[in-house]
Amino acid sequence: MRTSQYLLSTLKETPADAEVISHQLMLRAGMIRKLASGLYTWLPTGVRVLKKVENIVREEMNNAGAIEVLMPVVQPSELWQESGRWEQYGPELLRIADRGDRPFVLGPTHEEVITDLIRNELSSYKQLPLNFYQIQTKFRDEVRPRFGVMRSREFLMKDAYSFHTSQESLQETYDAMYAAYSKIFSRMGLDFRAVQADTGSIGGSASHEFQVLAQSGEDDVVFSDTSDYAANIELAEAIAPKEPRAAATQEMTLVDTPNAKTIAELVEQFNLPIEKTVKTLLVKAVEGSSFPLVALLVRGDHELNEVKAEKLPQVASPLTFATEEEIRAVVKAGPGSLGPVNMPIPVVIDRTVAAMSDFAAGANIDGKHYFGINWDRDVATPEIADIRNVVAGDPSPDGQGTLLIKRGIEVGHIFQLGTKYSEALKASVQGEDGRNQILTMGCYGIGVTRVVAAAIEQNYDERGIVWPDAIAPFQVAILPMNMHKSFRVQELAEKLYSELRAQGIEVLLDDRKERPGVMFADMELIGIPHTIVLGDRNLDNDDIEYKYRRNGEKQLIKTGDIVDYLVKQIKG
């Protein structure tokens, strides 16, 4: 490819609305342009990277025995009503109507469509197991699209769905997909972790996320410092303290705290250790409960884990925090003065709180706290559950080592769905015993566009993107200095361009009438791994300057050796 016949579209300045580095660099490198909130046009450089990612995904899915299909983006509402997700999915599901006012959705996912296909196409257990995948556009009406293609409304996704007649068969395919995903992200040169995860709105039982480690990540990834244990923080178990609860040394005292409405203010004003404080959060109770709210207690320096809390049988789903008005109607005090003593609604305390003594908490009276609270003396020990986020230094749930926490970007997710969708849509085959058998399902997703952004978050420097070789838009950049004035430089540039292309190498020849500084800046911004610079001064000595983008090292290579050298660097 020649720059004179290509849309480079690089920008010198960083757009003001680009928050994270991947969004900034994708705009500056001419990979994407914003059309509307959460909607992006992919420009040629971006498409080249996207296709590289797609090809790796497709190769490994095919190698794992999956079969490619292509399903419609627009889906009839009847399927979503049949599965029960028409009401459950929420406002992210974009509902539309055709000219006959028939309702449809723009698909955020394709469980319903593939299950409908399979229930009509398969009839016998002898046809199973089967695993189908597609690389297709998805649409989710995000309330706040941000971070460029990291959280956009329209995106490209590889989604796969497997069908089985036994849990054992599902487990085999699940393990094969786990291995395929590991190969996919390894081939792309990404630093990632496969972690245990919550199944969320997709449903099902077992689940793993594939997280690319990056400071800009939206997820907290938890892993042991000595074992293979890894989990999303939503799922990581907080082990109960091993030490028995210390004996009480203080009497419970009612203290005026008119200006302490948060744990931070309480700690600062009364010089309390934060580990001796408890915060109380009120959430809505499950429908049909005799109480409107449930009180959840965690230590002052810990955070409530909303995924764990939502799984409590007495808590409404989705988890909904009570408003101040709802709190005052039940407790007669504001949110900053809540605690377990004389709490008139059910209470659930975290395991760490259960091990505390002589602690401070709200008195359920505005502007007052109790200090020196002790369980079973001042208030009965309520229900105990794991409802907090783990913190760095906590013991690993597998009993090996302590936990580390890093930020991650979710780029893949695999689920064991079980029979959730096949039961709802009555997808069955004739079993070995001649009777109808409901199918067991798995589903496996990769955010293809998100992978591109995640790769940039791991691979950049002050000059631009530093692509892993496998997904770079071009493999080699040829920069001929003063090409339009030097016949020797022009002739050699054309010769090398042809020879490298003949070797199957993707080359970008910068044949613009531009200053050398602009040419260098653009190639480094785009992130092409290998650059060769042709100039009269070096050619006087039969030399070509070679630069490797990742480490910035330069070396002079003889003109006659440069093609073989590049082929060896790229193909090994």
From Swiss-Prot:
Pfam families tied to this protein: HGTP_anticodon (PF03129), tRNA-synt_2b (PF00587), tRNA_edit (PF04073)
One annotated Gene Ontology cellular component of this protein: cytosol
Record's catalysed reaction(s): tRNA(Pro) + L-proline + ATP = L-prolyl-tRNA(Pro) + AMP + diphosphate
InterPro entries: aa-tRNA-synt_IIb, aa-tRNA-synth_II, aa-tRNA-synth_II/BPL/LPL, Anticodon-bd, Anticodon-bd_dom_sf, Pro-tRNA-ligase_IIa, Pro-tRNA-synth_IIa_bac-type, Pro-tRNA-Synthase_IIa_type1
Domain of life: Bacteria
Top enzyme class: ligase
Function: Catalyzes the attachment of proline to tRNA(Pro) in a two-step reaction: proline is first activated by ATP to form Pro-AMP and then transferred to the acceptor end of tRNA(Pro). As ProRS can inadvertently accommodate and process non-cognate amino acids such as alanine and cysteine, to avoid such errors it has two additional distinct editing activities against alanine. One activity is designated as 'pretransfer' editing and involves the tRNA(Pro)-independent hydrolysis of activated Ala-AMP.
Enzyme Commission identifier(s): 6.1.1.15
Matches recorded under NCBIfam families: PRK09194.1, proS_fam_II
Gene: proS
One of the protein's GO biological processes: prolyl-tRNA aminoacylation
Family of this protein: Belongs to the class-II aminoacyl-tRNA synthetase family. ProS type 1 subfamily.
Subcellular location: Cytoplasm
CDD domains tied to this protein: ProRS-INS (cd04334), ProRS_anticodon_short (cd00861), ProRS_core_prok (cd00779)
Gene3D superfamilies to which the protein is assigned, alphabetical: Anticodon-binding domain, Bira Bifunctional Protein, Domain 2, YbaK/aminoacyl-tRNA synthetase-associated domain
GO molecular function terms noted in the UniProt entry: aminoacyl-tRNA deacylase activity; ATP binding; proline-tRNA ligase activity
Descriptive protein name: Proline--tRNA ligase
Domain notes: Consists of three domains: the N-terminal catalytic domain, the editing domain and the C-terminal anticodon-binding domain.
Subunit structure: Homodimer.
Keywords: Aminoacyl-tRNA synthetase, ATP-binding, Cytoplasm, Ligase, Nucleotide-binding, Protein biosynthesis
